[in-house]
Amino acid sequence: MYNIDTIKKIDSQLAEAIELEVNRQRNKIELIASENFVSDAVIEALGTPLTNKYAEGYPGKRYYGGCEYVDIVEQLAIDRAKQIFGAEHANVQPHSGAQANTAVYFAFLNPGDTILGMNLAHGGHLSHGSPVNISGKYYKVVPYGVREDNCYIDYDELRKTAKENSPKIIVAGASAYPRILDFKAFREIADEVGAILMVDMAHIAGLVAAGVHPSPVPYADVVTTTTHKTLRGPRGGMILCKQEYAKKIDSAVFPGNQGGPLMHVIAAKAVSFKEALTDDFKIYQQNIVKNAKALASALMEKGFKLVSDGTDNHLMLINLTNMNITGKEAQHKLDEVCITCNKNGIPFDTQSPFITSGIRLGTPAVTSRGMNEEDMKEIADLIHLTISDFENSRTNIIRRVEALCNKYPLYE
């Protein structure tokens, strides 16, 4: 269990803020799809004196002396990442998923080259070419999206767009897409136009590690990911690639995109990767998907419309247009009753990104607490009451949320 007694002695204001946040995590139902609860071992690794060490370069090829032990740490993380995903090469130094993506662009593209990435409004990510992101400012970006009738990726239209625009890189991956990605189809399209296939599996990395979602590694030239979310490690990034691209990727990360790696974070990555190699982790990932399907089914039974009519992974998008409430309003009301989620645009949304017509829900964090499919039915009922009868049901909802959180204690 984490300990902040020393912080309390030195900085009571900071200690109070930390305790407030930990209590928030304990006492609210966490449904943000990109969040999770790491193990005590990961927290311990993050707080080690490894944070003191500069280690520019890579194991065995550092620019500083005294790196013989942090070399062991980083090599453990590298070897475990390769083992988990069956990858030929792994770079565990990216500070975030976005920086991992930026490093890949830096490795393969020149300013003005074309990226084909998923439209942010259809479930993509800022770092896949959004105009407000560096990826959308330095490169020409052509978006692809989902079909209007079923909200599945339109692979025929994707192929047509790729042939018309000849992208240097095709990015497969999303931040709000509830269905399985067809990596074989992406590979075929990339080959037809001579593009590098980059897969951003940040959201589904844990599912992939456990074999619950098809792996992109056999199909992609490069795979990026965060190490948190479903993978349940520390906040950070990672790049997997074919051996032929190893030198190019490593150079793009350091010195191309970053300086010294965060060795305490890499240690925490190594710990989480060891956890990901266990049978318990596989069961956990299976339960994430079971819980997501149970929550989605229960919500639809309550009259909620789900984008694509369900989910294959850990997340779902609720279309609130038939509920007379915006995503922003729903997020606020749910937070008032201690249920945390995020407003989210839906495909072909008529609301602004700051208002939205939907909310995104995910099950990694509640599954980490030990919640099961029956609990998902309870959560669905709580969400329904919050949206449909907030004023009359508020006190009852808060009481039921408290009971559920007490049943599954966190960081005690």
Swiss-Prot record:
Gene Ontology CC terms: cytosol
Keywords per UniProt: Amino-acid biosynthesis, Cytoplasm, One-carbon metabolism, Pyridoxal phosphate, Transferase
InterPro entries, per database record: PyrdxlP-dep_Trfase, PyrdxlP-dep_Trfase_major, PyrdxlP-dep_Trfase_small, Ser_HO-MeTrfase, Ser_HO-MeTrfase-like, Ser_HO-MeTrfase_PLP_BS, SHMT-like_dom
Catalytic activity annotation: (6R)-5,10-methylene-5,6,7,8-tetrahydrofolate + glycine + H2O = (6S)-5,6,7,8-tetrahydrofolate + L-serine
Gene Ontology MF terms in the entry: glycine hydroxymethyltransferase activity; pyridoxal phosphate binding
Pathway stated in the Swiss-Prot or TrEMBL entry: One-carbon metabolism; tetrahydrofolate interconversion; Amino-acid biosynthesis; glycine biosynthesis; glycine from L-serine: step 1/1
Main localization of the protein described in the UniProt heading: cytoplasm
Gene Ontology process terms (BP): glycine biosynthetic process from serine; tetrahydrofolate interconversion
UniProt modified residues of type N6-(pyridoxal phosphate)lysine: K229
Summary of the function given for this chain in its UniProt record: Catalyzes the reversible interconversion of serine and glycine with tetrahydrofolate (THF) serving as the one-carbon carrier. This reaction serves as the major source of one-carbon groups required for the biosynthesis of purines, thymidylate, methionine, and other important biomolecules. Also exhibits THF-independent aldolase activity toward beta-hydroxyamino acids, producing glycine and aldehydes, via a retro-aldol mechanism.
Name this polypeptide is given: Serine hydroxymethyltransferase
The gene coding this protein: glyA
